[in-house]
Regions:
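Gly/Ala-rich beta-loop-alpha elbow adjacent to hydrolase catalytic centers
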Residues: 3-8, 12
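Hydrophobic residues on the short alpha-helix immediately C-terminal to a glycine-rich phosphate/catalytic loop
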Residues: 15, 159-162
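Flexible "cap/lid" loop of the alpha/beta hydrolase fold
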Residues: 17-66, 93-97, 122, 130
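Helix-loop "lid/cap" segments that line or gate small-molecule binding pockets
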Residues: 66-76
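Active-site nucleophile elbow and catalytic-triad environment of alpha/beta-hydrolase enzymes
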Residues: 87-105
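Short, proline-enriched alpha-helix->beta-strand connector loops that line the catalytic pocket
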Residues: 106-111, 133-136
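Short beta-strand/loop motif that positions the catalytic acidic residue
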Residues: 113-115
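Conserved loop-alpha-helix segment in the C-terminal half of the alpha/beta-hydrolase fold
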Residues: 117-143, 149, 154, 161-162
């Protein structure tokens, strides 16, 4: 079973076609279809959708603006923990934006999707649309993009449900 959060959903979608993978779990994640990438999924945001505070590339990598991290990524996480998360960001390669999925695993694998209803990075309507298209079993919970930090019990329960499903 693969579990992906955010961009990790792209990785799970592509890698999940491996025969040893039997299930997928998306946590406020991108779930692209064939030939889609993060770039194609974010090119036409819904009207009024928040714009993620991604800084211009630095040496081929992307980061979120630390000053806006708490409000945009982890609004339901206490300020001290959110500041630590902002400081500990892992750089994201610019090339990852355009990496298109060749064969989406969700077409042939059962999958679950947790929609974070207060997410300001991937709009909840976009999450719902990707989950519906993937035929996912959907759970919704109030939470930011960092729902795995603010609501770990909800995330763990969904993973447990998927892991024990027939």
């Amino acid at each position: 079973m693969l579990v992906g959060h955010s961009y990790g959903g792209v990785v799970a979608t592509e890698a999940g076609t491996d025969p040893t993978v039997t299930k997928l779990v998306y946590i406020a994640a991108f779930a692209p279809d064939r030939a889609e990438s993060v770039a194609t999924l974010i090119q036409n945001p819904p009207p009024g959708a928040p714009v993620p505070p991604i800084l211009p590339p630095q040496d081929g990598f992307l980061f979120l603006d630390k000053a806006k991290f708490h409000a945009s990524f982890a609004a339901d996480v206490d300020a001290e923990k959110a500041a630590f998360m902002a400081d500990a960001q892992v750089p994201w390669g610019v090339g990852a934006l355009d990496g298109a999925v060749t064969e989406p695993a969700w077409r042939t694998r059962p999958n679950w999707y947790l929609v974070a209803t207060d997410d300001k990075m991937i709009p909840p309507p976009a999450q719902r649309a990707m989950a519906e298209r993937a035929g996912a079993t959907v759970t919704e919970a109030e939470g930011s993009h960092a729902i795995y930090v603010s609501k770990p019990d909800v995330v763990a329960a969904l993973i447990r449900t998927a892991a024990t499903a027939a």
